[in-house]
């Protein structure tokens, strides 16, 4: 089981290195790695498990963050509950907006329009706040292989697009704060979407 102790922090060279494609068909080792990464995200989002294991909540994880130069990422984005007229929360019909283990993921096309998360981004490998808009593509098309070894192509927008770009960046040795304009961190570029 992956814990916070397994996640390397900024300054560790692997975070700045480009990961290698995993070999297809996938090895049992790589399939298990992806499953463990996804389980970590599940645990980090479960209040009881997160407290018990001392986990910070996360929606994505890349193998680089475990010190492994493999193009393996896991993404787990929960759906938010809806609120009825009386202000009561209604559980979402689907628990997750996105739940995927992606091998050799790459962005094959993207929008010209930019987007950024309203409050900026964070990272399990960064133990400090880095304020500012992390400017990314508003929409992306991503190709990857799933754990069954099937080639997939998906179109993403809004928060899922941002999350997957963050994780793919890790496999290319790029950190989220590389996308922040350090001279004007909260600059809103023309036409940029702010994702809440």
Swiss-Prot record:
Pfam families, per database record: Pep_deformylase
Protein name (database record): Peptide deformylase
HAMAP family (alphabetical): Pep_deformylase
The family this protein is said to belong to: Belongs to the polypeptide deformylase family.
Keywords tagged on the record: Hydrolase, Iron, Metal-binding, Protein biosynthesis
Cofactor: Fe(2+)
Binding sites annotated in the UniProt record for Fe cation: 123, 166, 170
One Gene Ontology biological process: translation
Function: Removes the formyl group from the N-terminal Met of newly synthesized proteins. Requires at least a dipeptide for an efficient rate of reaction. N-terminal L-methionine is a prerequisite for activity but the enzyme has broad specificity at other positions.
Xref: InterPro entries: Peptide_deformylase, Peptide_deformylase_sf
Record keyword Metal-binding present: yes
Keyword Hydrolase: yes
Enzyme Commission designation: 3.5.1.88
Superkingdom, taxonomy of origin: Bacteria
GO molecular-function terms, A-Z: metal ion binding; peptide deformylase activity
Catalytic reactions on record: N-terminal N-formyl-L-methionyl-[peptide] + H2O = N-terminal L-methionyl-[peptide] + formate
Segments traversing the membrane: none
Active site, per annotation: 167
Co-factor note (free text): Binds 1 Fe(2+) ion.
């Amino acid at each position: 089981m992956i814990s916070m102790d397994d996640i390397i922090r900024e300054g560790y060279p692997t975070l700045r290195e480009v990961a290698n494609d995993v070999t297809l068909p996938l090895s049992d080792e790589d399939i298990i790695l992806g499953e463990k990464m996804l389980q970590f995200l599940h645990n980090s989002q479960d209040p009881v498990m997160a407290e018990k294991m001392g986990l910070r909540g996360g929606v994505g994880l890349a193998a680089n963050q475990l010190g492994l130069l493999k193009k393996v990422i896991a993404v787990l984005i929960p759906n938010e509950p809806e609120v009825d007229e009386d202000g009561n929360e209604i559980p979402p019909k689907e628990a997750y907006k996105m739940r995927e283990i992606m091998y050799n993921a790459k962005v094959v096309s993207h929008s010209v329009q930019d987007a950024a998360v309203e409050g900026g981004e964070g990272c399990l490998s960064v133990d400090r706040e880095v304020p500012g808009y992390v400017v990314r593509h508003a929409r992306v098309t991503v190709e990857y292989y799933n754990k069954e070894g099937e080639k997939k192509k998906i179109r993403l927008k809004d928060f899922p697009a941002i999350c997957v770009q963050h994780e793919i960046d890790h496999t290319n040795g790029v950190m989220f704060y590389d996308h922040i304009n350090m001279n004007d961190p909260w600059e809103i570029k023309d036409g940029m979407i702010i994702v809440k």
